[in-house]
Amino acid sequence: MDKVLLGCHVSMNKQNNYLVGSVNEAISYKANTFMIFTGPPQSTLRTNTNHLYINQMHELMNSYKIDAKDLVVHAPYIINIANSVDQNKWEFAVNFLIQEIKRCEEIKIPTLVLHPGSYTTGNYKDSLNQIIKALDMVSNYQVNVKIALETMSGKGTEVCSKLEDFKYILDNVKNKDKVGVCLDTCHLHDAGYDLSKWTEFKEQIKQNFNLDKVLCIHLNDSKNMISSHKDRHANIGYGFVGFDTLVNVVFDKDFSNISKILETPYIDKKAPYKIEIEDLLNKTFTNRL
């Protein structure tokens, strides 16, 4: 089998030379891929990409055999392209998403994960149509970047906790090659999908869209029981999804060419990723966190 693409969310900040620091952090965890935000996830503040050490980042990655095509950017949380109630907020979301797409193109990271959003006080189906409308609008700015809509837990008024929602969106967007899906294992579990029956779950995916539409996987355990609709991530092996189930996901041959990204909680202000990556690759839960 090819190498397993396994990494995590890493920081990007000025004191660590932005993207160079992101690569160094990933290397320190023995990760061979990673995910970043291009700026604060809850704000519009952004540092110009000219100052992010893009060339140095790619040189450093080359020396460690990390391929830029495997990297992932997470879009800001404040983008809600599902808003069918407030036109101004929807337009803000679309314009901010366009900015993020441009930044991904400049950094040369080809996958942009996006939370589909919430219907707030609106109608559920209208929200799905707003998502489609937004994706059609931003597609002109996508040259090498694909948007991966993330599976959600169904907390509050979130849309896209059901695979059928993704089928509807993927069937109706104009530029189908520019949109895919990010599977989040915690969110899927919290939404009611039993991932311990992984083969059966993959069949459910195939009833709605092709497996090659899955562009990346967020690998998280869950602090809550199945169908809880909570979205509280647990460390690998310490939650209700379970270590063996997550090992099955990591080593699934159908997904060998896409990145599995950990977004698990820090323990005592320390990242757990080095231990989690080691345990997953060794297929052995060592209970060291």
From Swiss-Prot:
It comes from the Bacteria. GO terms for molecular function: deoxyribonuclease IV (phage-T4-induced) activity; DNA binding; DNA-(apurinic or apyrimidinic site) endonuclease activity; phosphoric diester hydrolase activity; zinc ion binding. Endonuclease IV plays a role in DNA repair. It cleaves phosphodiester bonds at apurinic or apyrimidinic (AP) sites, generating a 3'-hydroxyl group and a 5'-terminal sugar phosphate. Pfam families: AP_endonuc_2. This is Probable endonuclease 4. One of its GO terms (biological process) is base-excision repair. PROSITE patterns: AP_NUCLEASE_F2_1, AP_NUCLEASE_F2_2, AP_NUCLEASE_F2_4. Zn(2+) 1 binds at residues 74, 115, 150. Zn(2+) 3 binds at residues 187, 231, 233. Its EC number is 3.1.21.2. Belongs to the AP endonuclease 2 family. Its cofactor is Zn(2+). Binds 3 Zn(2+) ions. InterPro entries: AP_endonuc_2, AP_endonuc_F2_Zn_BS, Xyl_isomerase-like_sf, Xyl_isomerase-like_TIM-brl. Zn(2+) 2 binds at residues 150, 184, 218, 263. The gene is nfo. It catalyses: Endonucleolytic cleavage to 5'-phosphooligonucleotide end-products. Keywords: DNA damage, DNA repair, Endonuclease, Hydrolase, Metal-binding, Nuclease, Zinc.
